[in-house]
């Protein structure tokens, strides 16, 4: 989503609150809880899950391994739920032609760098760069090349834009900023 006028362009960035992240966190939580229940039921010798008898799974080594996978999955699921709760990666890109300033803001993990705020002068922008890597896992990323700072990604690599959409976005942004486009 974006908002645009003659002199200001604001591009809102979605972050980790995506439907796919909710689905993966939920599936991972249920799966790891199931593994932990099976491992615990094999240790205690009781049936917590009525699909099979607890005697079918011996605690050493299958029960230990299933408990380990369950605990590891719960940690990963907790990490995913925390990134969703904190909305890590969300923010905005603000391009202001009137003031000649570019502001990039992203939310990070709690701590010193929770708020990531970058500020550049528009005259320091060298180009808008499109990087396309074709293959099994196609990757298309849009960068802003800053003099003395390097390349700053404007679009995340996991966002599935078509080549045409990336080119369109790069062309509009380059026209707005009055800088050239580079393709790699």
UniProtKB/Swiss-Prot annotation:
Topological relation to the membrane, as annotated: Multi-pass membrane protein
Main location: plastid
Domain of life of the native organism: Eukaryota
Keyword field contains Transmembrane: yes
Compartments where found: Plastid, Chloroplast thylakoid membrane
GO terms under cellular component: chloroplast thylakoid membrane; photosystem I
Alphabetic keyword roster: Chloroplast, Membrane, Photosynthesis, Plastid, Thylakoid, Transmembrane, Transmembrane helix
Gene Ontology BP, a term: photosynthesis
TM stretches of this protein: 22-42, 57-77
Annotated function: Seems to be required for the assembly of the photosystem I complex.
Family: Belongs to the Ycf4 family.
PANTHER family the UniProt entry points to: PHOTOSYSTEM I ASSEMBLY PROTEIN YCF4 (PTHR33288:SF4), PTHR33288
Name this polypeptide is given: Photosystem I assembly protein Ycf4
Species of origin: Lobularia maritima (Sweet alyssum)
Taxonomic classification: Eukaryota, Viridiplantae, Streptophyta, Embryophyta, Tracheophyta
């Amino acid at each position: 989503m974006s908002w645009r006028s003659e002199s200001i362009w604001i591009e809102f960035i979605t972050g980790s609150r995506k439907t796919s992240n909710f689905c993966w966190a939920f599936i991972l939580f249920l799966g790891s809880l199931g593994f932990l229940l099976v491992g615990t039921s094999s240790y205690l010798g009781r049936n917590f899950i009525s699909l099979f008898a607890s005697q079918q799974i011996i605690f050493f080594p299958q029960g230990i391994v299933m408990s380990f996978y369950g605990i590891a999955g719960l940690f990963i699921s907790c990490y995913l739920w925390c990134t969703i709760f904190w909305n890590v990666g969300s923010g905005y890109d603000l391009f202001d032609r009137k003031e000649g300033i570019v502001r990039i803001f992203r939310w990070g993990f709690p701590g010193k760098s929770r708020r990531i705020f970058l500020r550049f002068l528009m005259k320091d922008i060298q180009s808008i760069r499109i990087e396309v890597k074709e293959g099994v896992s196609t990757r298309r990323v849009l960068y802003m090349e800053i003099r003395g700072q390097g390349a700053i990604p404007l679009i995340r690599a996991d966002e599935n834009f078509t080549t045409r959409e990336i080119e369109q976005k790069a062309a509009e942004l380059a026209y707005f900023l009055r800088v050239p486009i580079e393709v790699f």
